[in-house]
Amino acid sequence: FIMMLGLAGVALDLMRYEERRTVLQNTADRAVLAAADLNQTIPCKDVVKDYFVKGGLPAPSDSQINCQNGAFDEWREVTVAVSEDLPTWFMNMYGIPKLATPAAATAEERIGQVEISLVLDVSGSMDSNSRLINLKPAAKKFIDDMFDSVEEGKLSISIVPFNTQVSIGPDLIDYFNLDADHDFSYCLEFDPNDFKTTSLTTNIDPVTGNVDLAARKYKQNGHFDAFAGSSTYTPSPDFGLNCTQDRGRDILAFSGNRDQLKAYIDSFDAYGYTSIDLGMKWGAALLDPAMAPIVDDMIAAGTLKDSSGKVLSEFGDRPYQFSNQEALKVVVLMSDGANTTEYELQPDVDSGLSPLWRSNSTTYNGSTSAAQYSLWDQSRGQYYIFYNNTWRNEAWGDGTYKTCGTCAFKPDPGDAVQLSWQEVWDRMTVNWYARYIHGRAYGLATTNAWSSSWSPSNSVVKHETNKDAQTLDICTTFKSANNTLYGRRPQIYTIAFEAPNAGINVLRSCASSTTQFYNASGSTIGGTFTAIASSINKLRLTY
């Protein structure tokens, strides 16, 4: 009987032990969860101690509590390890006067994923008043601030430089079906309705990963120089072309490499007009989950790497769904101007074969003379030969011509080759063609004559009046992209950098709130980008 009583007493001590250990463990669990909350304003160790005291337990010592924070409070980890001696009632008779009741708990809270599109104006006016000079260090510090405040692998930044157009480069353009593609430059044209959606339709089937040729076709912007005067034959490879050929101006998409991003910003120069709507469209599109197949393909190809050269396979889910509760999507849009002019070729001179033929004779290698060309006129059924200013039945290079004093007929040099419209615009500026090809063939000697005859119906279309509306359409669409009860609202920060009133009004209306619009000048642009980085980090902490 005494032995049975002793065993019952031991069982009672063990029950008391387990009850006390459970109380300790539950209190420790609740304490670290509360202390690790990133919204918690009370000092971490004070929170833990308070939970124990209110639970009727001794407060842990400072040495029993470990609190760690990220440099920008982007993460917090709290650990507590305690032990309490429980006096025994019956086990003492067997030489066990007390039982240690340990409890340990760890809790961690970390900020989720961040996706940023940095949309920067690099139009010609950015060369004025040292704006581009001031922008570069400011934007690079923003890059550093963001990478310093976000865990490795959780931040991606796309940079979208814009002027008259936005060049997306040969790699990115391959993910879109085009109605008339060429390899001279890489810009897309959009319809007004495209600014009422954040997405673009890629040619990658989201299920199979194969190329989908039935997907929507986009119109590729023509390769042409509409800026140069009629005396300029060769298009400027950078400053004259509507869509630049400078590969250093292509969109840098989905980068997790701060060194790559900063070097890219350093390479900028300024030229061209201003198309805020196109910049914002691409900034929003690069944050839309429709781009996810492109990111997956870039990871598979090994082209998405961090500064150490490691492939960023963790980017595989980007861009995240707008409803994702852990992802924050941000556009930072900077311009020093207002929407001005965008050019598009008229359909008749945008693609397909032109009426212009050229002799491929080596005589004309490097030549800028009209003598190498002939122009077909469908209504006459003849070619105008610029070599001798006559009409005849064969293109220059396919017939013969008469020379005097011998008055003999000689074969034309070379063979005639019909040029596509894109080949024409790669060779000559729009105004040179209008004056020295169209104007000369039809006897239009004055500037007014050849310009009014050819330009209105055939050359370029300007888009000025609707660009502000398109900008506000895409801004509104992006800000309201997540209309669910879940996830985070996409955010837009805008900077008017010494901009005129028209630009200020558009940028202010585009921003997510009045406090997310900044009016900057001179070197204060640096403080503006610092403030935006700080605001983004606060947004990450308050969701």
Regions found by a protein language model. Give the residues of each.
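MIDAS-like acidic motif and immediate structural context at the N-terminus
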Residues: 6-9, 13, 110-135, 332-340
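Extended low-complexity, polyampholyte segments enriched in Ser/Thr/Pro and acidic residues
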Residues: 41-108
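Acidic, Ser/Thr/Gly/Pro-rich low-complexity segments that form flexible
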Residues: 173-260, 264-493
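Low-complexity, S/T/G/P-rich flexible repeat/linker segments used as non-globular hinges
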Residues: 88-129, 137-144, 525-543
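An active-site-proximal "capping" alpha-helix that borders the catalytic cofactor pocket
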Residues: 28-31, 134-154, 162
